[in-house]
Amino acid sequence: MAEPTVVIAPTTVPREDLGHGEPLLMTAKQVKKTPGLEREGWWRLTITDTPIPGTYHFRTFTEEALLNPVKITYNFKNEGRKKLPLVLRNDPVPTDLPQYSPPDFLELLKKQTASYSFKDKPRADPSTLVDKDESLHLCPGQYEVLPAPVPKSPARSFVFRSSVQRFPPNYFTPHEGPGPGDYELKASPKGSITSCFRSKVPRFLPVSSKTPGPGAYTSSRQFPKQSSTIAKMGREHSLFFNNTIGF
């Protein structure tokens, strides 16, 4: 709601003359006051009717990915490639179909000669690993194309299935003499390693010396009684002692 504009009309105000004594007439200027709402609300005119939030639909990440013209050949969760071959399409076009049928995996596997097998099946015969003469049409067991590569010898356990021939038994024939543990070997004494600078002085032996050691003698009594000066000098300098070694 717009407020009315206030217009102030010009007025004549008498004023005394300072010098001549005649009154002067002063005319006030016409001032137009604009209300504050109209002066500060100019931005309201630029506001238009806008839709509320949620009016527009924003495409999600999945929808954006489906709009990609390039077909993906991978997927998440480690599922691998899932691009359908031409023969498994829902609406195949005759020009897209191959001109031949691909061979089966089992047929290709049967044509290959396997040199190994699973744990519960024995290995193939070595004679089947070589090229055969297709012109031979004999029953099994009537001929031997190739001899056995290594003569087989019986083993005690199924774990040792080596086809290599063992050592001949003549190396392990018993000999005369005591068996292991029936005698004791006498090892020759070995000299200890010593230094050339070894001291020859005997260790921890009594030393035959006539020099008395500490405590081997006792002080003798001063008899007759000496003066205090001589007795003091005897105690300080050990002038009077009695050797108890007895030599």
Swiss-Prot record:
Which tissues and organs express this gene's product?
A: Expressed in ovary and testis. Expressed in spermatocytes I in the pachytene stage, round spermatids, and elongated spermatids. Expressed in the germinal vesicle (GV) stage and stage 2 meiosis (MII) oocytes and pre-implantation embryos until blastocyst stage (at protein level).
Which Gene Ontology cellular-component terms appear in the entry? cytoplasm; female germ cell nucleus; female pronucleus; germinal vesicle; male germ cell nucleus; male pronucleus; nucleoplasm
- Which GO MF terms are attached to this record? chromatin binding; histone binding
**Subcellular location(s) per record:** Cytoplasm; Nucleus
UniProt keyword annotations, A-Z:
Chromatin regulator, Cytoplasm, Developmental protein, Nucleus
What does this protein do, in the record's words? Answer: Maternal factor that plays a role in epigenetic chromatin reprogramming during early development of the zygote. Involved in the regulation of gametic DNA demethylation by inducing the conversion of the modified genomic base 5-methylcytosine (5mC) into 5-hydroxymethylcytosine (5hmC).
- Grouped into one coarse class, the protein's main location is cytoplasm
Protein's name according to its UniProt entry: Protein STPG4
Species this protein is from: Mus musculus
The residues forming the signal peptide are none
Knockout consequences: No visible phenotype. Mice were born at the expected Mendelian ratio and show no overt phenotype. Zygotes however display strongly reduced levels of 5-hydroxymethylcytosine (5hmC).
Q: Which PANTHER family match?
A: PROTEIN STPG4
**Where would one find coiled-coil regions in this protein?**
none
Instruction: State whether it acts alone or in a complex, and with which partners, per the record.
Output: Interacts with histone H3. Interacts with histone H4. Interacts with METTL23.
Any one biological process term the GO annotation gives: pyrimidine-containing compound catabolic process
Family annotation (InterPro entries): SHIPPO-rpt
- The gene it comes from is Stpg4
